[in-house]
Amino acid sequence: MALLVWQEYTEKLYKKDLHNPDNHDDVITNLEPDILESEVKRALESITTNKASGGDGIPVELFQILKDAAVKVLHSICQQIWKTQQWPQDWKRSVFIPIPKKGNAKECSKYRTISLTSHASKVMLKILQARLQQYMNRELPDALGVELGYLF
């Protein structure tokens, strides 16, 4: 199928109505503490190996081989993102891979898509996820009277 057809299909499939990303009127200025190298290391160690790389082509195994050097570089980048609230443009991009479903796969809707995201971006996402989880564990059980993970 033509590249343009796939581009239009995935844009329509994943399009969301989001607020203007350039409008920072409601930005929180007093953020949580700085990101720690230990958070970066923990996030990096938690990323599954033997997975396809994102658009940057950097496999997670390279970060894991470089160990402390990679942690220091990723920590610096993650800290910059945390302070400026600006996500690198390359980290916002994903590569979509169509995988045919059973049957006749002549239409885009007969495929499922997976998205390949930069492993460096995943490190920051895992840090944010861990911080949100800690916050929710700390705040929500008191408010809701339930423990996360045991809602249903």
Q: Which ranges hold each PLM region?
A:
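Electropositive, glycine- and tryptophan-enriched low-complexity nucleic-acid-binding patches
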Residues: L125-K126, Q133-G149
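Short, compositionally biased segments
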Residues: A2-W6, L144-F152
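Surface-exposed loop/turn segments and immediately adjacent short secondary-structure elements
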Residues: M1-K110, S115, H119-V123
